[in-house]
């Protein structure tokens, strides 16, 4: 399964290699923008993209980015809850 994480393109770092800097939930990541570049790379500044393994795979709007980030946060919270439930069950069974 391929999971893209929303990131906002904040800088072009190497136009020749089609590299940019994206802000992914407050963390700056180097990303290749070759898959989403349709004109001057500077046109990508401020845009949101789904990023997977260092590549901007598709452009999305800010609302979709917010919805995706919220869903990912919810998924993380669900995983934490399931892990806590498993730990509790193990403790009750004398395994923890």
Swiss-Prot record:
GO molecular-function terms, A-Z: carbon dioxide binding; iron ion binding
Gene3D superfamilies with a match to the protein in the record: 2.30.30.140
Pathway listed: Protein modification; [NiFe] hydrogenase maturation
TM ranges: none
UniProt superkingdom: Bacteria
Family matches, as InterPro entries: Hydgase_assmbl_chp_CS, Hydrogenase_HupF/HypC
Gene Ontology biological process: protein maturation
Purpose of the protein: Involved in the maturation of [NiFe] hydrogenases. Involved in the biosynthesis of the Fe(CN)(2)CO cofactor.
Protein family (similarity comment): Belongs to the HupF/HypC family.
NCBIfam families, sorted: hypC_hupF
Name this polypeptide is given: Hydrogenase maturation factor HypC
Organism of origin: Rhodobacter capsulatus (Rhodopseudomonas capsulata)
Gene: hypC
């Amino acid at each position: 399964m391929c999971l893209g994480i929303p990131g906002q393109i904040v800088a072009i770092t190497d136009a020749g290699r089609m590299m940019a800097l994206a802000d992914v939930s407050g963390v700056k990541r180097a990303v290749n923008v070759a898959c989403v570049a349709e004109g001057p790379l500077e046109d990508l500044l401020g845009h949101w993209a789904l990023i997977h393994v260092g590549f901007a795979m598709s452009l999305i709007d800010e609302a979709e980015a917010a919805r995706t980030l919220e869903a990912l946060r919810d998924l993380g919270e669900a995983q934490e809850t399931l892990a806590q439930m498993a730990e509790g069950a193990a403790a009750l069974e004398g395994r923890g």
